[in-house]
């Protein structure tokens, strides 16, 4: 029989998962790779993952793009049908796989390295000793929190932590590059956020 959670227990489990994100992850190495490859080298950040992890990867890419770091999502399966040609030698790739064993993502690494042997990879995973961890340059652990799903299977707490680790990278890079309200308004013209960013532009918040 599956476990039954109260609303309070679900919220507590999600909060605890965030509290137990490892503090000793090499965040600085991941941030430095993005800065050196994208902002200094002119490459792009490519994110990738399958299933729910892939949806998180897509969100991270769009958030990076809107905040001054050119990024896009590459579907691991579509990469095998021509989309791998979107990758350039100066890029850096951010992979997300909770198990660290996702076949399509492992194949993506192998195929990319066949084209560009020195292209660096960052991995967000719940399994530090996984096959993917052995292949990448930087591993960021989620702490492998138990899923709050009553079956213990559906990605729930794990995807919460993946999202937060993505936010950590985005915000850290924004701060390093000095991203301003004006910069934001140029990339996000429409909607409430576009209006708000333009309202906040002042002589003290110029573009870089």
Could you describe each region identified by the protein language model?
Residues 12, 16-23, 39, 69, ...:
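Generic secondary-structure signature for well-ordered alpha-helical cores
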Residues 134, 148, 175-207:
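Internal, active-site/partner-interface "lid" segment
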Residues 35, 44-177:
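Glycine-rich phosphate-binding loops that contact phosphosugars or nucleotide phosphates
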Residues 1-43:
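An N-terminal, well-structured beta->alpha segment
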Residues 38-49, 66, 195-206:
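Short, charged low-complexity intrinsically disordered segments located at boundaries
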Residues 3-6, 10, 22, 52, ...:
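Catalytic cores of large soluble enzymes that bind and process phosphate-bearing ligands
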């Amino acid at each position: 029989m599956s476990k039954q959670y109260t609303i309070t227990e679900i919220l507590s489990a999600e909060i605890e998962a965030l509290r137990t994100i490892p503090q000793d992850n090499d965040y600085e190495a991941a941030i430095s790779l993005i800065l050196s490859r994208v902002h200094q080298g002119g490459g792009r950040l490519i994110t990738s993952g399958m299933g729910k992890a892939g949806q998180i990867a897509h969100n991270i890419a769009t958030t990076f793009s809107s905040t001054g770091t050119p990024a896009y999502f590459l579907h691991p399966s579509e990469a095998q049908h021509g989309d791998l040609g979107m990758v350039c030698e100066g890029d850096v790739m951010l992979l997300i796989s909770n198990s660290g064993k996702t076949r399509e993502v492992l194949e993506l690494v192998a195929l990319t390295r066949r084209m560009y042997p020195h292209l660096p990879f960052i991995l967000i995973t719940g399994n530090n000793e996984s096959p993917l961890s052995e292949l990448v340059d930087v591993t960021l652990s989620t702490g492998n929190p138990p899923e709050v799903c009553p079956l213990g299977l559906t990605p729930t707490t794990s995807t919460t932590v993946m999202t937060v680790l993505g936010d950590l990278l985005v915000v850290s890079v924004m701060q390093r590059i000095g991203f301003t309200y004006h910069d934001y308004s140029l990339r996000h013209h429409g909607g409430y956020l576009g209006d708000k960013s333009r309202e906040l532009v002042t002589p003290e918040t110029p573009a870089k």
